[in-house]
Amino acid sequence: MPRSVWKGPFCDNYVIKLARRARGNPNVLIKIRSRRSVILPAFVGYTFGVYNGKVFIPVKVNENMVGHKFGEFSPTRTFNGHSGDRKVNKK
């Protein structure tokens, strides 16, 4: 279920503080670990490094991302593919 409208979007306070510090320079990578925070309109144009459990993945925020969460743009699992042609052909 989605969040109630009357509560408003959730964003960790330290994410907002880091974005305010980088207000003058939008090219700086803002490293965050909060995948649960919602992308606010004030974050458009900034580059966030979203932690996926191993590395910080750079995410350049644009207008289409507003309202989504940071975790949606940094995958945590890698898919190596299925074996495919390795199967033995029985004759």
Swiss-Prot record:
GO biological process, one term: ribosomal small subunit assembly
Alphabetical list of PROSITE patterns matching this protein: RIBOSOMAL_S19
Key words, A-Z: Ribonucleoprotein, Ribosomal protein, RNA-binding, rRNA-binding
GO CC terms, sorted: cytoplasm; small ribosomal subunit
A Pfam family that the UniProt record links to this protein: Ribosomal_S19
InterPro entries: Ribosomal_uS19, Ribosomal_uS19_bac-type, Ribosomal_uS19_CS, Ribosomal_uS19_SF
GO MF annotation list: rRNA binding; structural constituent of ribosome
SUPFAM superfamilies (UniProt xref): Ribosomal protein S19
Keyword Ribosomal protein: yes
Function: Protein S19 forms a complex with S13 that binds strongly to the 16S ribosomal RNA.
Family: Belongs to the universal ribosomal protein uS19 family.
Name of the featured protein: Small ribosomal subunit protein uS19
Origin species: Neorickettsia sennetsu (strain ATCC VR-367 / Miyayama)
Gene: rpsS
